[in-house]
Protein backbone atom coordinates (compact mmCIF):
# COMPACT_ATOMS: atom_id res chain seq x y z
CA UNK A 1 0.00 0.00 0.00
CA UNK A 2 1.14 3.53 -0.78
CA UNK A 3 0.23 5.90 2.05
CA UNK A 4 1.17 9.52 1.43
CA UNK A 5 0.77 12.53 3.71
CA UNK A 6 1.75 15.58 1.62
CA UNK A 7 2.14 17.79 4.70
CA UNK A 8 4.63 15.33 6.23
CA UNK A 9 6.55 15.25 2.93
CA UNK A 10 6.67 19.06 2.74
CA UNK A 11 7.90 19.39 6.33
CA UNK A 12 10.52 16.68 5.72
CA UNK A 13 11.75 18.55 2.63
CA UNK A 14 12.20 21.69 4.72
CA UNK A 15 14.09 19.67 7.32
CA UNK A 16 16.38 18.22 4.64
CA UNK A 17 16.95 21.65 3.09
CA UNK A 18 18.04 22.93 6.52
CA UNK A 19 20.32 20.03 7.42
CA UNK A 20 21.51 18.55 4.09
CA UNK A 21 20.69 20.74 1.06
CA UNK A 22 22.50 18.40 -1.34
CA UNK A 23 20.13 15.57 -0.41
CA UNK A 24 17.30 17.98 -1.23
CA UNK A 25 18.98 18.57 -4.60
CA UNK A 26 19.18 14.81 -5.28
CA UNK A 27 15.50 14.43 -4.40
CA UNK A 28 14.48 17.16 -6.84
CA UNK A 29 16.54 15.47 -9.58
CA UNK A 30 15.07 12.03 -8.90
CA UNK A 31 11.55 13.47 -9.00
CA UNK A 32 12.44 15.18 -12.31
CA UNK A 33 11.74 18.64 -10.88
CA UNK A 34 15.29 20.05 -11.29
CA UNK A 35 18.56 18.89 -12.78
CA UNK A 36 21.76 18.66 -10.76
CA UNK A 37 23.02 22.06 -11.91
CA UNK A 38 20.11 23.86 -10.19
CA UNK A 39 21.19 26.29 -7.45
CA UNK A 40 21.49 24.78 -3.99
CA UNK A 41 18.38 25.55 -1.95
CA UNK A 42 19.67 27.08 1.26
CA UNK A 43 17.15 27.77 4.01
CA UNK A 44 18.42 30.48 6.39
CA UNK A 45 18.43 30.21 10.17
CA UNK A 46 16.61 32.80 12.23
CA UNK A 47 13.01 33.75 12.90
CA UNK A 48 10.34 32.08 10.73
CA UNK A 49 6.82 33.52 10.71
CA UNK A 50 4.20 30.96 9.69
CA UNK A 51 0.78 32.25 8.67
CA UNK A 52 -1.92 29.64 9.22
CA UNK A 53 -1.99 27.28 12.20
CA UNK A 54 -3.46 24.30 10.33
CA UNK A 55 -2.11 20.79 9.71
CA UNK A 56 0.58 21.92 7.28
CA UNK A 57 1.76 24.76 9.48
CA UNK A 58 2.01 22.49 12.50
CA UNK A 59 3.99 19.86 10.56
CA UNK A 60 6.45 22.53 9.39
CA UNK A 61 6.75 23.82 12.96
CA UNK A 62 7.74 20.34 14.21
CA UNK A 63 10.75 20.26 11.86
CA UNK A 64 11.79 23.86 12.49
CA UNK A 65 11.56 23.34 16.25
CA UNK A 66 13.64 20.16 15.91
CA UNK A 67 16.36 22.31 14.31
CA UNK A 68 16.18 24.91 17.11
CA UNK A 69 14.72 27.56 14.82
CA UNK A 70 12.53 30.26 16.35
CA UNK A 71 8.96 30.24 15.04
CA UNK A 72 6.00 32.57 15.44
CA UNK A 73 2.53 31.66 14.18
CA UNK A 74 -0.14 34.04 12.99
CA UNK A 75 -3.66 32.59 12.96
CA UNK A 76 -6.66 34.65 11.86
CA UNK A 77 -9.35 32.47 13.48
CA UNK A 78 -9.59 33.31 17.22
CA UNK A 79 -11.75 30.22 17.80
CA UNK A 80 -8.62 28.10 17.46
CA UNK A 81 -7.31 29.71 20.62
CA UNK A 82 -9.70 27.65 22.72
CA UNK A 83 -8.01 24.45 21.53
CA UNK A 84 -4.42 25.55 22.15
CA UNK A 85 -2.27 24.15 24.92
CA UNK A 86 -0.35 26.40 27.30
CA UNK A 87 2.86 25.83 25.29
CA UNK A 88 1.17 26.60 21.97
CA UNK A 89 -0.07 29.93 23.29
CA UNK A 90 3.58 30.99 23.67
CA UNK A 91 4.18 31.07 19.92
CA UNK A 92 0.72 31.53 18.33
CA UNK A 93 -0.73 35.04 17.99
CA UNK A 94 -4.13 35.88 16.56
CA UNK A 95 -4.65 38.52 13.90
CA UNK A 96 -4.57 39.29 10.18
CA UNK A 97 -1.21 38.27 8.65
CA UNK A 98 -1.96 40.53 5.68
CA UNK A 99 -2.14 43.59 7.93
CA UNK A 100 1.01 45.69 7.65
CA UNK A 101 1.02 46.94 11.24
CA UNK A 102 0.26 43.50 12.67
CA UNK A 103 3.14 41.95 10.70
CA UNK A 104 5.52 44.59 12.06
CA UNK A 105 4.24 43.96 15.57
CA UNK A 106 4.83 40.21 15.11
CA UNK A 107 8.47 40.74 14.08
CA UNK A 108 8.49 40.64 10.28
CA UNK A 109 11.37 43.15 10.12
CA UNK A 110 13.65 40.71 11.98
CA UNK A 111 12.38 37.51 10.34
CA UNK A 112 14.43 35.56 7.78
CA UNK A 113 11.43 33.72 6.31
CA UNK A 114 7.67 34.04 6.01
CA UNK A 115 5.56 30.95 5.30
CA UNK A 116 1.97 31.38 4.07
CA UNK A 117 0.08 28.10 4.40
CA UNK A 118 -3.61 28.99 4.57
CA UNK A 119 -6.07 27.09 2.37
CA UNK A 120 -6.68 30.16 0.20
CA UNK A 121 -4.20 31.01 -2.58
CA UNK A 122 -5.19 34.68 -2.85
CA UNK A 123 -4.63 35.12 0.88
CA UNK A 124 -1.24 33.38 0.73
CA UNK A 125 -0.01 35.56 -2.16
CA UNK A 126 -1.27 38.73 -0.50
CA UNK A 127 0.47 37.89 2.79
CA UNK A 128 3.78 37.30 1.02
CA UNK A 129 3.47 40.52 -1.01
CA UNK A 130 2.86 42.55 2.16
CA UNK A 131 5.75 40.85 3.98
CA UNK A 132 8.10 41.42 1.03
CA UNK A 133 7.32 45.14 0.95
CA UNK A 134 8.21 45.43 4.62
CA UNK A 135 11.29 43.18 4.46
CA UNK A 136 12.64 42.87 0.88
CA UNK A 137 15.34 40.37 1.95
CA UNK A 138 12.93 37.89 3.52
CA UNK A 139 12.62 34.37 2.06
CA UNK A 140 9.06 33.58 0.97
CA UNK A 141 7.38 30.17 1.09
CA UNK A 142 3.80 29.35 0.19
CA UNK A 143 1.23 26.62 -0.01
CA UNK A 144 -0.40 26.48 -3.45
CA UNK A 145 -3.82 24.89 -3.11
CA UNK A 146 -5.05 25.03 -6.70
CA UNK A 147 -2.83 24.06 -9.65
CA UNK A 148 -4.76 26.58 -11.74
CA UNK A 149 -3.00 29.31 -9.73
CA UNK A 150 0.47 28.08 -10.72
CA UNK A 151 1.11 31.07 -13.01
CA UNK A 152 0.18 33.52 -10.25
CA UNK A 153 2.65 31.98 -7.80
CA UNK A 154 5.48 31.95 -10.33
CA UNK A 155 4.73 35.54 -11.35
CA UNK A 156 4.94 36.55 -7.69
CA UNK A 157 8.52 35.21 -7.51
CA UNK A 158 7.81 33.11 -4.43
CA UNK A 159 11.08 31.47 -3.35
CA UNK A 160 9.58 28.09 -2.46
CA UNK A 161 6.16 26.85 -3.56
CA UNK A 162 4.67 23.73 -2.00
CA UNK A 163 1.69 22.20 -3.83
CA UNK A 164 0.17 19.27 -1.88
CA UNK A 165 -1.72 17.88 -4.91
CA UNK A 166 1.42 17.93 -7.08
CA UNK A 167 3.46 16.30 -4.33
CA UNK A 168 0.87 13.52 -4.06
CA UNK A 169 1.05 12.85 -7.80
CA UNK A 170 4.88 12.86 -7.84
CA UNK A 171 5.15 10.55 -4.85
CA UNK A 172 2.51 8.03 -5.94
CA UNK A 173 3.70 7.98 -9.57
CA UNK A 174 7.30 7.43 -8.49
CA UNK A 175 6.35 4.65 -6.07
CA UNK A 176 4.30 2.85 -8.73
CA UNK A 177 6.52 3.21 -11.78
CA UNK A 178 9.99 3.65 -10.23
CA UNK A 179 9.90 1.51 -7.07
CA UNK A 180 13.68 1.25 -6.71
CA UNK A 181 14.04 4.99 -7.10
CA UNK A 182 11.42 5.42 -4.37
CA UNK A 183 13.41 3.11 -2.07
CA UNK A 184 16.62 5.02 -2.85
CA UNK A 185 14.99 8.34 -1.94
CA UNK A 186 13.91 6.91 1.43
CA UNK A 187 17.44 5.64 2.10
CA UNK A 188 19.35 8.82 1.25
CA UNK A 189 17.37 10.82 3.82
CA UNK A 190 19.53 9.07 6.44
CA UNK A 191 22.76 10.16 4.72
CA UNK A 192 24.64 13.38 5.46
CA UNK A 193 25.21 16.43 3.28
CA UNK A 194 28.86 15.55 2.60
CA UNK A 195 27.89 12.17 1.13
CA UNK A 196 25.18 13.77 -1.03
CA UNK A 197 27.52 16.54 -2.19
CA UNK A 198 30.08 13.99 -3.41
CA UNK A 199 27.40 12.00 -5.26
CA UNK A 200 26.20 15.17 -7.01
CA UNK A 201 29.77 15.95 -8.09
CA UNK A 202 30.36 12.38 -9.32
CA UNK A 203 27.13 12.29 -11.31
CA UNK A 204 27.84 15.62 -13.01
CA UNK A 205 31.50 14.85 -13.74
CA UNK A 206 31.10 11.24 -14.85
CA UNK A 207 27.77 11.55 -16.69
CA UNK A 208 26.06 14.96 -17.03
CA UNK A 209 23.85 17.42 -15.17
CA UNK A 210 20.70 15.35 -15.75
CA UNK A 211 21.53 11.63 -15.87
CA UNK A 212 18.89 9.14 -16.92
CA UNK A 213 17.78 6.90 -14.05
CA UNK A 214 17.31 3.28 -15.16
CA UNK A 215 15.86 0.42 -13.13
CA UNK A 216 16.70 -3.14 -14.21
CA UNK A 217 15.43 -6.39 -12.77
CA UNK A 218 17.92 -9.20 -13.31
CA UNK A 219 15.98 -12.25 -14.47
CA UNK A 220 15.90 -14.76 -17.31
CA UNK A 221 13.64 -12.59 -19.43
CA UNK A 222 15.33 -9.19 -19.04
CA UNK A 223 18.99 -10.14 -18.69
CA UNK A 224 19.38 -13.81 -19.70
CA UNK A 225 23.20 -13.94 -19.89
CA UNK A 226 23.74 -12.15 -16.59
CA UNK A 227 21.07 -14.29 -14.96
CA UNK A 228 22.65 -17.56 -16.17
CA UNK A 229 26.10 -16.38 -15.09
CA UNK A 230 24.92 -15.60 -11.57
CA UNK A 231 22.91 -18.82 -11.29
CA UNK A 232 26.12 -20.74 -11.96
CA UNK A 233 27.59 -19.10 -8.83
CA UNK A 234 30.14 -17.18 -10.87
CA UNK A 235 31.19 -13.69 -9.78
CA UNK A 236 30.11 -10.76 -11.90
CA UNK A 237 31.53 -7.28 -11.48
CA UNK A 238 29.57 -4.11 -12.10
CA UNK A 239 32.27 -2.86 -14.45
CA UNK A 240 30.85 -5.18 -17.12
CA UNK A 241 27.98 -2.69 -17.43
CA UNK A 242 30.49 -0.04 -18.46
CA UNK A 243 31.25 -1.91 -21.69
CA UNK A 244 29.11 -0.90 -24.66
CA UNK A 245 27.04 -3.67 -26.28
CA UNK A 246 27.78 -2.20 -29.69
CA UNK A 247 31.51 -1.51 -29.44
CA UNK A 248 33.79 -3.04 -26.83
CA UNK A 249 36.09 -0.02 -27.09
CA UNK A 250 33.31 2.35 -26.06
CA UNK A 251 32.40 2.86 -22.43
CA UNK A 252 28.98 3.47 -20.93
CA UNK A 253 28.81 6.33 -18.45
CA UNK A 254 27.01 5.06 -15.38
CA UNK A 255 27.05 5.14 -11.59
CA UNK A 256 25.30 2.35 -9.63
CA UNK A 257 22.98 3.79 -6.99
CA UNK A 258 21.12 0.85 -5.47
CA UNK A 259 21.15 -2.95 -5.45
CA UNK A 260 18.14 -4.68 -3.95
CA UNK A 261 18.08 -8.42 -3.41
CA UNK A 262 14.86 -10.39 -3.08
CA UNK A 263 16.11 -12.20 0.00
Segments and roles (model prediction):
Residues 1-18, 86-180:
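Phosphate-bearing ligand-interacting subdomains
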Residues 2-83, 159-263:
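Cytosolic regulatory domains of K+ homeostasis systems
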Amino acid sequence: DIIVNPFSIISSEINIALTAPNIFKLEKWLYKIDDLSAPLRIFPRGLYIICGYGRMGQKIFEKLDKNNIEVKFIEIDPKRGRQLSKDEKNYVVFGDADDRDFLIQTGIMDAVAVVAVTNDDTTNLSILATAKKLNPEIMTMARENDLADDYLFKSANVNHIFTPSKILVNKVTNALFNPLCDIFIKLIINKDNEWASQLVVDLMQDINKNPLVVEVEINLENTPEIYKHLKSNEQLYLKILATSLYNREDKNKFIPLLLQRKN
